[in-house]
Amino acid sequence: MSKSTAEIRQAFLDFFHSKGHQVVASSSLVPNNDPTLLFTNAGMNQFKDVFLGLDKRNYSRATTSQRCVRAGGKHNDLENVGYTARHHTFFEMLGNFSFGDYFKHDAIQFAWELLTGENWFALPKERLWVTVYETDDEAYEIWEKEVGIPRERIIRIGDNKGAPYASDNFWQMGDTGPCGPCTEIFYDHGDHIWGGPPGSPEEDGDRYIEIWNIVFMQFNRQADGTMEPLPKPSVDTGMGLERIAAVLQHVNSNYDIDLFRTLIEAVAKVTGATDLGNKSLRVIADHIRSCAFLVADGVLPSNENRGYVLRRIIRRAVRHGNMLGAKETFFYKLVGPLIEVMGSAGEELKRQQAQVEQVLKTEEEQFARTLERGLALLDEELAKLQGDTLDGETAFRLYDTYGFPVDLTADVCRERNIKVDEAGFEAAMEEQRRRAREASGFGADYNAMIRVDSASEFKGYDHLELNGKVTALFVDGKAVEAINAGQEAVVVLDQTPFYAESGGQVGDKGELKGAGFTFAVDDTQKYGQAIGHLGKLSAGALKVGDAVQADVDEARRARIRLNHSATHLMHAALRQVLGTHVAQKGSLVSDKVLRFDFSHNEAMKPSEIREVEDLVNAQIRRNLPIETNIMDLDAAKAKGAMALFGEKYDERVRVLSMGDFSTELCGGTHASRTGDIGLFRIISESGTAAGIRRIEAVTGEGAMATVHAQSDRLNDIAHLLKGDSQNLGDKVRAVLERTRQLEKELQQLKDQAAAQESANLSSKAVDLNGVKLLVSELAGIEPKMLRTMVDDLKNQLGSTVIVLATVVEGKVSLIAGVSKDVTDRVKAGELIGMVAQQVGGKGGGRPDMAQAGGTDAAALPAALASVQGWVSAKLQ
């Protein structure tokens, strides 16, 4: 009996654990501290800084099953998903890694043992082929002489992409940096499937499938293209779980493995589909995986960046559900079946199931309202299309009006062998793209891309002043030896009391001072293991190696500490009041305010806000000690410490406890006791996205300032009402009641005036072939009274056509009324449109009543004068 996908995942991890590898959990799909990546798309992403030498771990061997998404950006598989055997938006990458430990010999031997060992995957050896880089004789000889693969099944692949080292078998992190040859392992499905071995003209067939890529990082590529050997060569491998599952379960398509069969059956059940071979079932089964895990990792549907990619995937799935005949929202119902098939890999998703389902349901409901109309418009455009290309303007209109991502439109068109003018679409989208996705893209400023080889020691938990030494200087992202007065720069010290922005807490400000120089620090950021002080040299000169005195702005840091501690108290209070589904989705801890985004599906009630406030202030009054302990990550979690899912933690973590009320992992700076916070007040609660709420709050002096401001406002109102704050409610209710009474009396007077005006106007009507025509501009009449007057005049005049106008603050208001017996000849909507066009406006309505507005009051007399001729022509 073949292994299940879950068993294959576990077997891989167990194998490498038995070989001395640390089993590391999958990192978030949102890359941590890497502005160059849209989504985590490979197992090595979370170890990038380790390979670059910017991060150190307490292990030199690791193994993971990493969740990955490839959709959007460079890796965009979206249009192929569901239509090929192996394209996915979401997949799991099995990997083993060596950080300066073992190299080619062990990496190859491990792979061979796992794939062919009787106690492991037990694949037939004769079915396995390998490729090596053309000049990698070492790997070739290991495969041939040690493993025993015949030469005819070992293929050398050279520079097949048009440049030196541009090869399927040479891996590079970028234009510079770690790189090296790789060896790939292929599985031969047999001659009953078309295709040739790698490197042959038929290599794109499905007979020979790559199942494992083993990268040997042995060089450091310089800017001039030269390759320098790395002092500690490393190994990075990747094997797609879905691919190896297909091989081990003896199927040719990833969509036929047990995991996808179960999901496809679930999709068929919720959509009512009966043909399990329908490609739309595959599309939806794939898309629920990426969408559910993206939402669980904090991505929400939006019109920019990651959120836009998520929206595109959701809407593509919904449209395929529509094709299958789904009559109601269905997509969110697949989260449960997904959790079941993921097993232990779906535990975090299970904890957030309700939140994920709500986000997906809300997005589907929003799109469903326009999907049918949008598809109808697209069908109409395609039906009258001359040629085989849909114009970009129509594609843009579908996006702008109906929320159709262009790739969804392209999907529909592809099914009819029609192309989309994407260049025209991009031209029409230029303004929106600049305002949304491009404007807020991932370029980051130059500071984010600085690479610092040195490390800084943070001593700011215990010190706000410290002597240190300059180890690096950067100007415009480039390393320099010295800076002069007036220059902006990033200064790196060997040790510093300045806290670098992290975990939502803003970076410190202050000064670096020394012999004849002063550097004003405006921000502090992390660069790998270094801490950079961003600012401007206000006096003197500063060079690498100089001694400095680092002084943190003490008052500002103190306010930040209070706000950070209050954030922890509020997080715990929210979970008590609203439920344990509350999870942090983002935060800002500054010296002025604390902002906290959290998962919750509805606006908080005033009573809930008050309860959270009261709970936090109760803990402040308890004056609990705020204690920190350093311990192993597993021990901290066992103690109940809350960890932020997707946050990157070291093996040793800092646990912050506030009595028995709150325990969290946190590297930030905090008060000594909860009583230091003084007072906590929530100043706003709002929604930021589906299923996400935001609270802003203040503490200490800031909280007292809000109390004083509120008291001052109450006193001002009491003074205006000639009362005091004690009976203010009664006073306001009395004023409101009196106001309502006066407004009622005023309306009665206006109605009487309008009725009188209508009576006066009726005598001005002229007869046109038995129809009374009345056209008049009225002064001093509110626009909303015109409708009442038209109704009165229609009752008085019988067969009639009426046009009334008034001008208020330069804006023209128009109304046309036509008695029902005349609407077969004169339509009020057409009439009002003719008049409105002349005064710079537009309008519309029913055949018997229509309204309009305009901006050109000077043109009104001429416009009204044209009515009689227009109506006369219609009545003839």
Curated annotation (Swiss-Prot):
Gene Ontology biological process terms in this record: alanyl-tRNA aminoacylation; negative regulation of DNA-templated transcription
EC number: 6.1.1.7
CDD domains: AlaRS_core (cd00673)
Record-level Gene Ontology MF annotations: alanine-tRNA ligase activity; aminoacyl-tRNA deacylase activity; ATP binding; tRNA binding; zinc ion binding
Keyword terms, alphabetized: Aminoacyl-tRNA synthetase, ATP-binding, Cytoplasm, Ligase, Metal-binding, Nucleotide-binding, Protein biosynthesis, RNA-binding, tRNA-binding, Zinc
Location of the protein in the cell: Cytoplasm
Cofactor: Zn(2+)
Pfam families recorded: DHHA1, tRNA-synt_2c, tRNA_SAD
Binding site for Zn(2+): 564, 568, 666, 670
InterPro entries, alphabetized: aa-tRNA-synth_II/BPL/LPL (IPR045864), Ala-tRNA-lgiase_IIc (IPR002318), Ala-tRNA-ligase_IIc_anticod-bd (IPR018162), Ala-tRNA-synth_IIc_core (IPR018165), Ala-tRNA-synth_IIc_N (IPR018164), Ala-tRNA_ligase (IPR050058), Ala_tRNA_ligase_euk/bac (IPR023033), DHHA1_dom (IPR003156)
Record-stated family: Belongs to the class-II aminoacyl-tRNA synthetase family.
Annotated function: Catalyzes the attachment of alanine to tRNA(Ala) in a two-step reaction: alanine is first activated by ATP to form Ala-AMP and then transferred to the acceptor end of tRNA(Ala). Also edits incorrectly charged Ser-tRNA(Ala) and Gly-tRNA(Ala) via its editing domain.
The name this protein goes by in its record: Alanine--tRNA ligase
Organism per entry: Salmonella typhimurium (strain LT2 / SGSC1412 / ATCC 700720)
Gene: alaS
